[in-house]
């Protein structure tokens, strides 16, 4: 695994986590 794919994987994880966090925050859970 090279650094580019690793960076993309970490970016997708952070984006998905922050997006789900915003959705949970707006849902009031």
Curated annotation (Swiss-Prot):
Membrane topology (UniProt):
Single-pass membrane protein
Q: Which domain of life is it from?
A: Eukaryota
Give the matching Pfam families: PetN
| Protein location | Plastid, Chloroplast thylakoid membrane
What is a single molecular function from GO for this protein? electron transporter, transferring electrons within cytochrome b6/f complex of photosystem II activity
Which keywords belong to this entry? Chloroplast, Electron transport, Membrane, Photosynthesis, Plastid, Thylakoid, Transmembrane, Transmembrane helix, Transport
SUPFAM superfamilies recorded for this chain? PetN subunit of the cytochrome b6f complex (SSF103451)
Q: What is its main location?
A: plastid
| Gene Ontology cellular component terms for the protein in this record | chloroplast thylakoid membrane; cytochrome b6f complex
- Bilayer-crossing residues are 3-23
Which InterPro entries is this protein grouped with?
Cytochr_b6-f_cplx_su8_sf, Cytochrome_b6-f_cplx_su8
Q: Which GO terms describe its biological process?
A: cytochrome complex assembly; photosynthesis
Family to which this protein belongs? Belongs to the PetN family.
Q: What does this protein do?
A: Component of the cytochrome b6-f complex, which mediates electron transfer between photosystem II (PSII) and photosystem I (PSI), cyclic electron flow around PSI, and state transitions.
Record's subunit section = The 4 large subunits of the cytochrome b6-f complex are cytochrome b6, subunit IV (17 kDa polypeptide, PetD), cytochrome f and the Rieske protein, while the 4 small subunits are PetG, PetL, PetM and PetN. The complex functions as a dimer.
The record's section on HAMAP family has:
Cytb6_f_PetN
Name of the protein described by the UniProt record = Cytochrome b6-f complex subunit 8
* Organism per entry: Coffea arabica (Arabian coffee)
Lineage of the native species? Answer: Eukaryota, Viridiplantae, Streptophyta, Embryophyta, Tracheophyta
- The gene name reads petN
